[in-house]
From Swiss-Prot:
This is Medium-chain acyl-CoA ligase ACSF2, mitochondrial. GO terms for molecular function: ATP binding; medium-chain fatty acid-CoA ligase activity. Residues 1-42 form a transit peptide. Belongs to the ATP-dependent AMP-binding enzyme family. Pfam families: AMP-binding, AMP-binding_C. PANTHER family: ACYL-COA SYNTHETASE (PTHR43201), MEDIUM-CHAIN ACYL-COA LIGASE ACSF2, MITOCHONDRIAL (PTHR43201:SF5). It comes from the Eukaryota. InterPro entries: AMP-bd_C (IPR025110), AMP-bd_C_sf (IPR045851), AMP-binding_CS (IPR020845), AMP-dep_synth/lig_dom (IPR000873), ANL_N_sf (IPR042099). The gene is ACSF2. Its EC number is 6.2.1.2. It is found in: Mitochondrion. The keyword Lipid metabolism applies. The keyword Mitochondrion applies.
């Protein structure tokens, strides 16, 4: 393994003062890339295996810099891939019966980008994409980037109030959506906050509540006051509009904003994390490198994506990784369905599967699971929330996903900052979120003093590097609260780092329970309770207590048909976890309060439990 001189110098600095990294402004490129005399250069195949170890006995690590960062825009990356593998299948939309090669995808994207410019949108304007996974979603994602327009990822479950907040927050000039999906009638929801659309001239909307919104585009139906997406794309094929597109592209920079993604709002109103071409292109490239997609044949690298495109795991881990590495992306359904996911794997010969722990649980629990052909499966990515070790082992063994990796990140970090290598052991995958990604610094600091923690000691995880967002759109104060002057982004996650650089997420800083002076991390207890044979899901929160400050409350959802008691659960804990970690309260529940994106809102769960327990 290569050893970096810069890392050795940092180790000596850390040994003298754990605070030095908090004020450091960054290593020079020469310092970063210097190697000890006599250490041979690395081949391209070895680069991502060169993971520097934590230094000085402290929880700090810097990813290697052997892989060069790209200055290309998303559009230039699509151009390059279409030129390199024009006939390679790029996109399969299983539920729409659509198949496109990279050459065909580029042609359609160019026309759509040209069409958006032809209707008056310009570089820097914001366009909201509001709807479930579809061909139109991918088309808008890439076309906006090609034209310098900023894509705003709007949750397809948003109702009128949430939609109004999002569109006003970032000043959306255009909005694209299907007429409806299941019970979600998008046009009717828009009319609740923008009744003027029914009588508006298409492309000339004037709305009292949404003053920035001028253009509404319907994906699949002629609706009053809207343009039809097919007509916009058709207009883009005209030569004068393509000329305008080529002119616009001359002024695009990799550091321009490309995407605004709203954080989940588990602790308040959603914030618009703003990402650049530079953020997304490089993160996608490094995800694919660590998955070894660049070393696989087209038949070995077909990616099935049930994750929503409005999340970073879908848009970056899915669309952008496919684009960067020339692999086939398969969208299996508009929204996640376990059965549809298995159908896509079987029919499309899927090799890699991306998803959250909940998605994988549903796939594994399909009653006809054994009837599907999963022989082509090789690996995938699990991310989005903590995954119990038992689930990791089940995915690897039952889904034939020996190359499964766990990924960790945040929307604000584009998103992935830690990830396993495919060849890590099952234990390393089950007990950690892997090791730091290239060109990324990570440190864990004491939440009270801000100093570096020693190895294997919990603290707040902070990230610095190319991946950190440009900021929260229109909220400089919140941006400054999240990203310090030293450019460290504070994740709010409590983590530990071991001697090999493996990182374990143990909870959110706001979720940490302090019981009689003892720090207790809910994720640790949740992992433990998942070993109980009757427990399907569990969430642990702290509830107020006059004597101890906080007490532990375990909110348990049992497997279907199972019954047990609080006393039996507590008996299960004895002798297996410390006595002060045994919950005082055990509450059996059937569901949890969720955000619209499906994340559990622990602050609401805490409120519900305190009310339920009359505290």
């Amino acid at each position: 393994m290569a050893v970096y001189v810069g890392m050795l110098r940092v180790a000596r600095l850390c040994a003298r003062s754990p605070r030095v990294l908090g004020a450091r402004v960054g290593l020079s490129r020469v310092w970063q890339e210097a190697r000890l005399w006599g250490v041979r250069p690395l081949s391209s195949g070895e680069l991502d295996h060169t993971v520097p170890l934590p230094v000085g006995g402290f929880s700090y690590v810097q990813g290697h810099v052997g892989l060069h960062l790209s200055n290309k825009t998303v559009g230039r990356c699509l151009d390059a891939t279409a030129q390199r593998v024009p006939d390679q299948e790029a996109l399969v939309v299983h539920h729409e019966n659509i198949r496109l090669t990279f050459a065909q995808l580029k042609e359609e994207v160019d026309k759509a980008a040209s069409g958006l410019l032809s209707i008056g949108l310009r570089k820097g304007d914001r366009l909201g994409m509001w709807g479930p996974n579809s061909y139109a979603w991918v088309l808008m994602q890439l076309a906006t980037a090609q034209a310098g327009i900023i894509l705003v990822s709007v949750n397809p479950a948003y109702q009128a109030m949430e939609l109004e907040y999002a569109l006003k927050k970032v000043g959306c000039k255009a909005l694209v959506f299907p007429k409806q999906f299941k019970t979600q009638q998008y046009y009717n929801i828009l009319k609740q906050i923008c009744p003027e659309v029914e009588k508006a001239q298409p492309g000339a909307l004037k709305s009292q509540r949404l003053p920035d919104l001028t253009t509404v585009i319907s994906v699949d139906a002629h609706l009053p006051g809207t343009l039809l997406l097919d007509e916009v794309v058709a207009a883009g094929s005209q030569e004068q509009n393509l000329t305008r597109l080529r002119h616009t592209q001359q002024f695009l920079s990799c550091h321009d904003p490309i995407n605004i993604q709203f954080t989940s709002g588990t602790t308040g109103s959603p914030k618009g994390a703003t990402l650049s071409h530079y953020n997304i292109v490089n993160n996608a490239n490094m995800i694919g490198q660590r998955l070894r997609l660049h070393q696989k044949t087209p038949e070995e690298s077909r990616v099935v994506l049930p994750s929503p495109l409005y999340h970073c795991l879908g848009s970056v881990g899915g669309t952008m990784v496919s684009l960067m590495h020339g692999v086939t992306l398969i969208l299996c359904s508009p929204v996640f369905e376990g059965k549809k996911t298995l159908e896509a794997i079987s029919r499309e010969r899927g090799c890699f599967l991306y998803g959250t722990p909940t998605m994988f649980v549903d796939v594994l629990n399909q009653p006809d699971f054994s009837s599907y052909d999963i022989s082509t499966m090789r690996g995938g990515v699990i991310a989005g929330s903590p995954a119990p070790p038992e689930l990791i082992r089940a995915i690897i063994n039952k889904l034939n996903m020996k190359e499964l990796v766990v990924a960790y990140g945040t929307t604000e970090n584009s998103p992935v900052t830690f990830m396993n290598f495919t060849e890590d052991t099952v234990e390393q995958k089950a007990e950690s979120v892997g090791r730091v990604m290239p060109h990324t610094e990570a440190q864990i600091v004491n939440t009270e003093t801000g100093t570096l923690t020693e190895l294997n000691t919990p603290g707040e995880l902070c990230i610095r590097g190319y991946c950190v967002m440009l900021g929260y759109w229109g909220e400089p104060q919140k941006t400054e609260e999240a990203i310090g002057q030293d450019k460290w982004y504070r994740t709010g996650d409590i983590a530990m780092m071991d001697e090999q650089g493996f990182c374990k997420i143990v909870g959110r800083s706001k979720d940490m329970i302090i019981r009689g002076g003892e720090n207790i991390y809910p994720a640790e207890l949740e992992d433990f309770f998942h070993t109980h044979p009757q427990v399907q899901e569990v969430q642990v929160v702290g509830v107020k207590d006059d004597r101890m400050g906080e007490e532990i409350c375990a909110c348990i959802r049992l497997k279907e048909g199972e019954k047990t008691t609080a006393e039996e659960i507590k008996a299960f804990c004895k002798g297996k976890i410390s006595h002060f970690k045994i919950p005082r309260y055990i509450v059996f529940v059937t569901n949890y309060p969720l955000t619209v994106s499906g994340k559990i809102q622990k602050f609401k769960l805490r409120e519900q439990m305190e009310q339920h327990l009359n505290l």
